[in-house]
Amino acid sequence: AEPLFRSSCLIADELAEECDFFSIGTNDLTQYTCALDRQNAKLEPFFNPHHPAVLRAIKMTIEAGHRHGIWVGICGELGADTALTETFLRMGVDELSMNAKSILPVRKIIRSVDLSKPSEK
């Protein structure tokens, strides 16, 4: 399943009982969580994929998926967002989907993170 709406994140436990995996669609999740039209250039300054509500929805979904033993991935622009790579690793995400040009920068961060130590952020 691809949780795109805040409502699907809120019932992720129930959805996880019926699914083999979650692939969190971060572009739409951000749009719907922030109640914005991505096609409206005037609203672009308010489109914030780092908003605490978006990150909390992602974390809730990852935790629910893992409680039910299913794989959880991130797809959309946030998979390549190096500012969030460590955050997603600490949340327990199983996979980050991204375009080819983003693989090396993200891989560099993944290799540098020591999950046994507290976050420096």
Show where each model-derived region lies.
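Conserved alpha/beta-domain cores
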Residues: 1, 5-121
